[in-house]
From Swiss-Prot:
Record organism: Staphylococcus aureus (strain MRSA252)
Molecular function (Gene Ontology), one example: sigma factor activity
Family (UniProt): Belongs to the sigma-70 factor family.
Gene Ontology BP, a term: DNA-templated transcription initiation
DNA-binding region: 126-145
Classification via Pfam families: GerE, Sigma70_r2
Top-level lineage group: Bacteria
Protein name: RNA polymerase sigma factor SigS
Disulfide bonds: none
Keyword list, A-Z: DNA-binding, Sigma factor, Transcription, Transcription regulation
SUPFAM superfamilies xrefs: C-terminal effector domain of the bipartite response regulators (SSF46894), Sigma2 domain of RNA polymerase sigma factors (SSF88946)
Function text: Sigma factors are initiation factors that promote the attachment of RNA polymerase to specific initiation sites and are then released. Sigma-S contributes to the protection against external stress, thus playing a role in cellular fitness and survival.
Chain ranges for the short sequence motif Polymerase core binding as given in the UniProt record: 29-44
């Protein structure tokens, strides 16, 4: 399917997401980033998958927009940290608690479990993760249960 067709049918998803998150400042910049992401997603979409193109785009664009918000928050935190630094020549260090905990959890996991967790956090569905990792869905369920057990032990 050509991108012009995808755009004509699904461009309202971008407007909906921007309205959903009350984006008025930098609306055009966010719109352009989401439009580029829509083009990328239209290139990787497989019509044979169980998910319709509109739900695929909506879900992935929604997660992408949330990631953009997180990146913007990190940038603002870094700028604030730099402005309040006692010595301006000293490079401020930024620690995100989420990233630090994720690193600690990943240290407990084997390669398959780490790969599953990263794909899961990126928003992939179970059957998509199974395709990407070339495993059966039952194996993915076992990996998920193992990660869940390890995380529960870690956070107790």
């Amino acid at each position: 399917m050509k991108f012009n067709d995808v755009y004509n049918k699904h461009h309202k998803i971008i407007h909906h997401l921007l309205k959903k998150y009350n984006i008025s400042y930098n609306y055009d910049e966010y719109y352009q980033l989401l439009l580029i992401k829509m083009w990328q997603l239209s290139q990787i979409y497989k019509p044979s998958s169980n998910q319709s193109l509109s739900s695929f785009l909506f879900m992935r664009l929604n997660f992408y927009l949330i990631d953009l918000f997180r990146q913007q928050k990190r940038l603002n935190d870094i700028i604030l940290c730099e402005n309040h630094s006692p010595i301006l020549t000293e490079q401020p260090t930024y620690f995100n608690e989420y990233d630090l905990r994720l690193q600690d959890v990943c240290a407990l996991l084997n390669h398959r479990e780490r790969q599953w967790l990263m794909l899961y956090l990126e928003g992939y569905k179970q059957y998509e993760i199974a395709d990407i990792m070339s495993l059966s869905t039952s194996t993915i369920k076992l990996i998920k249960a193992s990660v869940k057990r390890k995380c529960q032990r870690f956070f107790k």
